[in-house]
Amino acid sequence: MKQPARTSQVKKPAARVKRKTREEINQEARDRKREKKHSGHASGSRANPATVSQKGDKSQSVKDPRIGSKKAIALGTDAPVRQPANPVKAAKPAVEKKPRLTPEEELAKLENDERLDALLDRLENGEALSAEDQAWLDQSLDRIDVLMEQLGIALDDDAEDEKAEEDMYRLLKGSHRTPE
């Protein structure tokens, strides 16, 4: 098969662009440099800012862009105390902070807790506890263990003390026999 001839492939000569001379290129570069030099703010623009007129706020004084205040502050003790324009409202105590209990007080409080006693009695009687009650009971018992450990109290502390005293007494007496 023969390919059809394409007539659109023939390129037409484009219009020639006139090349700039070296003098024209240099002049354009100088113009760009001159414009670039004057692109910043005018001298003194920070100290004397241009005022932008606003339609609604004509009564408002011009605000100083610099940080700080120009108001005089009385340094003497006889200066009158000024109240702020918007007095600060006292914050409402949403939740009063409970006074922090010492470990001894917290342990005594937990040992005298009626709910804890009732739940322990129910467990001793073989009753099943709800998941919520069981979780609270476990948490309370864990806290009691932590407090007792902090205070150096052990459950069988008394029996060990008596045994240790007997051993010390026998060592001091010179009797090396072991107790029966």
Curated annotation (Swiss-Prot):
- The reply on keyword Transit peptide is no
List the GO biological process terms.
ribosome biogenesis
Q: Where is this region: Disordered?
A: 1-102, 158-180
Q: Which Pfam families match?
A: YihI (PF04220)
Entries under InterPro entries matching the protein:
YihI
- Source domain of life is Bacteria
Segments of skewed composition (Basic and acidic residues):
21-32, 55-67
The biased composition feature labelled Low complexity covers: 84-93
Biased composition regions of type Polar residues, renumbered to the chain: 1-10, 45-54
Q: Which residues are listed as membrane-spanning?
A: none
**Keyword set includes Metal-binding:** no
Q: Which of UniProt's keywords are assigned here? A: GTPase activation, Ribosome biogenesis
User: Which terms in the Gene Ontology molecular function aspect does this entry carry?
Assistant: GTPase activator activity
Q: Which family does it belong to?
A: Belongs to the YihI family.
NCBIfam families per UniProt: PRK05244.1-1 (NF003560)
Known partners and oligomeric status: Interacts with Der.
Q: What does the UniProt record say this protein does?
A: A GTPase-activating protein (GAP) that modifies Der/EngA GTPase function. May play a role in ribosome biogenesis.
Q: What is this protein called?
A: Der GTPase-activating protein YihI
Organism in which the protein naturally occurs: Erwinia tasmaniensis (strain DSM 17950 / CFBP 7177 / CIP 109463 / NCPPB 4357 / Et1/99)
Name the gene that codes for it. yihI
